[in-house]
A protein has these predicted regions:
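Outer-membrane beta-barrel initiation region
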Residues: 1-33, 102-124
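Short amphipathic alpha-helical segments, especially helix-boundary/capping motifs
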Residues: 2, 83-88, 94-95, 106, ...
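Structural signature of outer-membrane beta-barrel channels/translocons
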Residues: 2-3, 26-32, 64-74, 82, ...
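Residue-level detector of the transmembrane beta-barrel scaffold of outer-membrane proteins
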Residues: 9-11, 35-39, 74-78, 129-133, ...
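Short, flexible loop/turn elements at secondary-structure junctions
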Residues: 16, 81, 134-138
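Short, glycine/acidic-rich beta->alpha junctions
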Residues: 17-19, 57, 146-150
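Outer-membrane beta-barrel translocator/channel fold
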Residues: 34-100, 171-183
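C-terminal outer-membrane beta-barrel translocator/porin domains of Gram-negative envelope proteins
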Residues: 41, 45, 51, 98-99, ...
Length: 183
């Protein structure tokens, strides 16, 4: 019971070609009513654009606060920092002369969550879940790009027969800004 109110979680995903990898570590402090969580995440993705190979590195840091009003309702705030680097593989004279692209992003996300569901077993839920959220991301450099997203997600799972469940989902979102999402 020494770490009953504290959690340390880590994870990784390594691809077969060892080029696209992800690493994550999380620390949660749950000993007061206001829960705190810090998440560090690193992702490396190898991709091809035209005739050139790129490697994208993304380092993200999240600070998450959760305030439960009761067992079913909570308010969540997430502060985000993200630093992206795009590196072109040196295959010829042109690609060797290209400089790395670097972008910094800062963001905030506010969520209201209603969750009356109960997990019966892995991926089998019964009950209702509703989330309403708004998120703002701002690129920290000369371009001054930003993104605002607002949306909702509602899910309902009901028992049909024994362990059979009927799940229904309704969701939607809209985004605005100089750097909109492409669906």
């Amino acid at each position: 019971d020494l770490f009953e109110d504290y959690r340390i979680t880590g994870g990784f995903r390594i691809s077969f070609d060892l080029q696209s990898n992800e690493f994550m570590i999380s620390y949660e402090d749950l000993h007061k009513r206001l829960d705190h969580q810090v998440v560090a995440y690193r992702q490396g993705i190898k991709s091809m654009v035209g005739d050139y190979y790129y490697k994208q590195y993304a380092n993200s840091l999240f600070y998450i606060m959760k305030y439960p009003f009761n067992k079913l309702n909570s308010l969540r705030l997430t502060l985000t920092g993200r630093y992206e680097t795009y590196v072109m593989a040196g295959l010829n004279d042109y690609s060797l002369k290209q400089k790395d692209e670097r972008h910094g992003w800062a963001g905030v996300k506010l969520e209201y969550v209603f969750d009356s569901s109960k997990e019966l077993c892995t991926n089998l839920w019964r009950g209702s879940k509703v989330k309403v959220f708004a998120e703002y991301q701002h690129r920290i450099d000369k371009d001054n790009k930003y993104l605002f997203v607002a949306g909702f997600d509602a899910r309902k799972s009901v028992k049909v027969f024994r362990n059979m469940t009927w799940a229904t989902r309704l969701s939607g979102s809209a985004n605005f800004g100089t750097s909109p999402l492409i669906y």
